[in-house]
Amino acid sequence: MRYFRPLSATAMTTVLLLAGTNVRAQPTEPTPASAHRPSISRGHYLAIAADCAACHTNGRDGQFLAGGYAISSPMGNIYSTNITPSKTHGIGNYTLEQFSKALRHGIRADGAQLYPAMPYDAYNRLTDEDVKSLYAYIMTEVKPVDAPSPKTQLPFPFSIRASLGIWKIAARIEGKPYVFDHTHNDDWNRGRYLVDELAHCGECHTPRNFLLAPNQSAYLAGADIGSWRAPNITNAPQSGIGSWSDQDLFQYLKTGKTAHARAAGPMAEAIEHSLQYLPDADISAIVTYLRSVPAKAESGQTVANFEHAGRPSSYSVANANSRRSNSTLTKTTDGAALYEAVCASCHQSDGKGSKDGYYPSLVGNTTTGQLNPNDLIASILYGVDRTTDNHEILMPAFGPDSLVQPLTDEQIATIADYVLSHFGNAQATVSADAVKQVRAGGKQVPLAKLASPGVMLLLGTGGILGAILVVAGLWWLISRRKKRSA
């Protein structure tokens, strides 16, 4: 997926006192075999399952795996690198060992640290066999592209790549081997390998701690991922996917569409570039494993997200139409009038969408049923664009660059509020400030504040004071020793 995964903290010596060690052990047992795909090599299959193209190809018109895609992070944009076998701008000169180090440990051939927008904390448990297959695929089947990708230039202190080595220790990013769990069958083990390693689902769906390392106590319980919300996919019946049928889960992962859910944002990209191409047996294995994930309930959720239906519409369409006109639409903040103007032609005045389901119902929809409204806000701001089975699903964006109807933060807030109260979870509310935050890329994480001028000044002042204290302490010790020897 194309949103930020964990990013380094600056080098903090105090953290090192609490840190563990980073040790790589080799797997002793193979993973369950994937479903048979005779039309492609195993390495090609693994590249699809690992979703390499989503980040390393710059949009639908970009050159395959040539990098250049801007991955949004709290510290700034991180540009994906060229991983074609180009010997001038790609990884064509990498040995298998160097490729493995980059993939599993985030260390380039020149020894520099890779930013963890690359999910090496998930890939570090890939088996040796799979790493070799991926290497063979990239080196022999991918077309080399002799073109550079933009350089990542993050603000200080995040521009210091060496600090990533300290972050890996402090955040306990360890290369633990994959171990086959003999208490479960092959299907479950294959599902776990796909979810935790290849598809790296936890990179988005597991929340992060202060150091932006995965908080495993809330494994797959949902997290903010840039402007979007990666939902809870534990087996919780109200907060997660516990009320979904196996068929619904299978269909959603394969197509991005069910009667009560539609994929958008990073999840739409994962389905478009990766999941839709996996064999049915592998999708079923993912469903099997997800069914075993312990439920993590969220406070305030009393029914499943798709069981909310808001309240019956209390306004007259005619009255709403009379309160707006093309000349006043840009200024109105009447939620009903705005909904009727920019939403109802597809989703209908009653919010139930088209009869054939092409335009989804907003009633009984997981996006409108969440307590966290970020996905609804982001869908309005950025639209929906996914292609599955060579069929594109498109909802226009209504953000500032909209070609259809640019809306202000306040207008988007009133539309979202109207949708939630009439068709979704009436407990959720949206403010103009919430829209502004989503538009800006989501909540600022505490570590990102290290790059602010005020914090840098404070850290700099603290460093100077610390140096003065150290010098003063040394002077005192030397003076004391001289007095004793006198």
Curated annotation (Swiss-Prot):
Regions annotated as coiled coil: none
Entry annotated with the keyword Iron: yes
List of residues binding heme c 2: 201, 204-205
TM segment ranges: 458-478
Subcellular location: Cell membrane
Record InterPro entries: Cyt_c-like_dom (IPR009056), Cyt_c-like_dom_sf (IPR036909), Cytochrome_c-type_DH (IPR051459), Membr-bd_ADH_cyt_c (IPR014353)
Membrane topology, from the record: Single-pass type I membrane protein
Record note on modification: Binds 3 heme c groups covalently per subunit.
Biotech use: This enzyme is commonly used in a number of research projects to examine the electrochemical properties of enzyme-catalyzed electrode reactions, named bioelectrocatalysis. Available as a commercial product from Sigma Aldrich (catalog number F4892).
Keyword set, alphabetical order: Cell membrane, Heme, Iron, Membrane, Metal-binding, Repeat, Signal, Transmembrane, Transmembrane helix
UniProt key word DNA-binding: no
Physiological role: Cytochrome subunit of fructose dehydrogenase, an enzyme that catalyzes the oxidation of D-fructose to produce 5-keto-D-fructose. In the complex, mediates both the electron transfer to ubiquinone and the anchoring of the complex to the membrane.
SUBUNIT field: Heterotrimer composed of FdhL, FdhS and FdhC.
Designated name of the protein: Fructose dehydrogenase cytochrome subunit
Name of the coding gene: fdhC
